Amino acid sequence: MRIAILGGTYNPVHIGHMFLAKELEHFLNVDKILFIPTHKPVHKRVENISVKDRIAMLKLAVQHEKNMFIDECDIVNGGITYTVDTIACIKNKYVHDDIYLVIGDDLFESFDSWKNPEKIVESVNLVVVHRIYSERLISRFKHTYIDNRIFPISSSEIRHRIEQGLPVDYLLPFDVLRYIKNNNLYVKGK
């Protein structure tokens, strides 16, 4: 089986994440896509939202997708999340499968500063997608580039729009938007 893994905070998951997953199905011909929410990312703060809420939103986003699943290995392990450890966890579950680690070009730019990058590229197929740059970045690490569309939205922009009372309709899966509204998530002062 061919499995793509997409790690992130998903704070919140939005249509850019879902659109990328669909493009990965097409370009990589994967059988399964695993969304892996991080517990405590190394280079990012997750503010004012519980792990429970982030997972609930992810479940709502993938509920009608037959090839998309959530793996909570980083949540279960707790603490700071390193990709090399996440990969070890996934490879223990999917011993005989081809694993594709998908990262954005914004992260790939600093990939050599990650914990054990050599071990990562030895363990999985590294796939880079466009998030910021339209041109391909050069690296000493073996990787594959996907010529995906850059989707000009981010979770931080969505949080900001909600705090400011601006519309976010159609930027989020409908059930995720409803969950955010029903639980007053990302509202300023909360």
UniProtKB/Swiss-Prot annotation:
InterPro entries registered for this protein in UniProt: Cyt_trans-like, NadD/NMNAT, Rossmann-like_a/b/a_fold
Cited Pfam families: CTP_transf_like
GO terms for MF: ATP binding; nicotinate-nucleotide adenylyltransferase activity
Record has Zinc as a keyword: no
Single biological process term from Gene Ontology: NAD biosynthetic process
Catalysed reactions, semicolon-separated: nicotinate beta-D-ribonucleotide + ATP + H(+) = deamido-NAD(+) + diphosphate
Top-level division of the source organism's lineage: Bacteria
Keywords for this protein: ATP-binding, NAD, Nucleotide-binding, Nucleotidyltransferase, Pyridine nucleotide biosynthesis, Transferase
Record EC number: 2.7.7.18
Pathway: Cofactor biosynthesis; NAD(+) biosynthesis; deamido-NAD(+) from nicotinate D-ribonucleotide: step 1/1
Family of the protein in this entry: Belongs to the NadD family.
Biological role stated in the UniProt entry: Catalyzes the reversible adenylation of nicotinate mononucleotide (NaMN) to nicotinic acid adenine dinucleotide (NaAD).
Name the UniProt record assigns to this protein: Probable nicotinate-nucleotide adenylyltransferase
